[in-house]
Amino acid sequence: ERADYALKKGLPVFVSECAGMEANGNGEIDMKEWNLWLSWMKKHAVSWAAWSIADKDETCSMLYPSAPDAGWADKDIKEWGHVVKHALLAK
């Protein structure tokens, strides 16, 4: 609601550190809620950034610990990384 209000007032809105799991970066990925956010951002032409390009033991980390520093193959990318990759490629 606050973002809708800001947009109506002509203020710039950028969604940073968004994700589809609990605010602490863990828990199950809630695809229903994530897709609602994606739809809202697309509808309002709001840019976004997802987190985290890391290999930590948390849901929001996009890489497995075995991933190389660059040139990631699908096997190096965790579930959340694939979700974000798909959303970005769909733009």
Task: Locate each region found by the language model.
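Substrate-binding cleft of secreted/luminal carbohydrate-active enzymes
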Residues: 8-91
